[in-house]
Amino acid sequence: MTTSRCSHLPEVLPDCTSSAPSGKTVEDCSSLVNGQPQYVMQVSAKDGQLLSTVVRTLTTQSSFNDHPMCRICHEGSTQEDLLSPCECTGTLGTIHRSCLEHWLSSSNTSYCELCHFRFSVERKPRPLVEWLRNPGPQHEKRTLFGDMVCFLFITPLATISGWLCLRGAVDHLHFSSRLEAVGLIALTVALFTIYLFWTLVSFRYHCRLYNEWRRTNQRVILVIPKSANLPSAQQSLLGLHSFKRNSKETIV
């Protein structure tokens, strides 16, 4: 995960002269609204996918010390309890479980890219139906849809054509027309050979795309150790105290 520099230390003015990380842009981090400076916080996955963006005035930064928030969605603990699953401290030390699982799934990693703490996770493959609904980029969607339409159209056509050719070959054999019968049989074999070759090539191509999608789009479940399974109220209270204590260490 990559974050803009002005989102790490809310007590420090953002450095607007620094360039944004690759795959992400920071827009107008020195703008003024009602005479108050603003700063932009953005969180991106490793592949450049933007996970969250928030714009706040500088006067609201002091509230971060008293009200911890998720470092990805920048929301508090009203909807979901905040956790501290890694060794990050200060404003980057708390995160929602659902946000962390979504980020680990999007970035296809199992560790924190800030403190390099490796999380204990379970990865489960997503169902085939989900891939059929959204196989990936637009050109892959068009290819999958086109091949499915061709398969549904060519399969009965090839079957009927092969049956008619074989029926004609049998009729020619009854009338001692062996040359025509051999020609129809050869046509039937060529027809089914081309059909099977196209089917196998298309099937292998889409199987490769599905296996790659299944490997990079797994559902991640964060496993919290049993020793860390505290009641939600006690865990939130401990997380709040530790956040207040560690947030002072981030001031430089």
Swiss-Prot record:
Binding-site list for Zn(2+) 2: 86, 88, 112, 115
Localization: Cytoplasmic vesicle membrane; Early endosome membrane
Stretches that traverse the bilayer: 144-164, 181-201
Q: Which GO terms describe its molecular function?
A: ubiquitin-protein transferase activity; zinc ion binding
Which pathway does the UniProt entry assign to this protein? Protein modification; protein ubiquitination
Which reaction does this chain catalyze? S-ubiquitinyl-[E2 ubiquitin-conjugating enzyme]-L-cysteine + [acceptor protein]-L-lysine = [E2 ubiquitin-conjugating enzyme]-L-cysteine + N(6)-ubiquitinyl-[acceptor protein]-L-lysine
**UniProt zinc finger (RING-CH-type) residues:** 62-122
Q: How does it sit in the membrane?
A: Multi-pass membrane protein
EC number annotated for this UniProt entry: 2.3.2.27
Q: What is known of its domains?
A: The RING-CH-type zinc finger domain is required for E3 ligase activity.
* Protein name as catalogued: E3 ubiquitin-protein ligase MARCHF3
Q: Which organism is it from?
A: Xenopus laevis (African clawed frog)
Taxonomic lineage of this organism? Answer: Eukaryota, Metazoa, Chordata, Craniata, Vertebrata
Q: Which gene encodes it?
A: marchf3
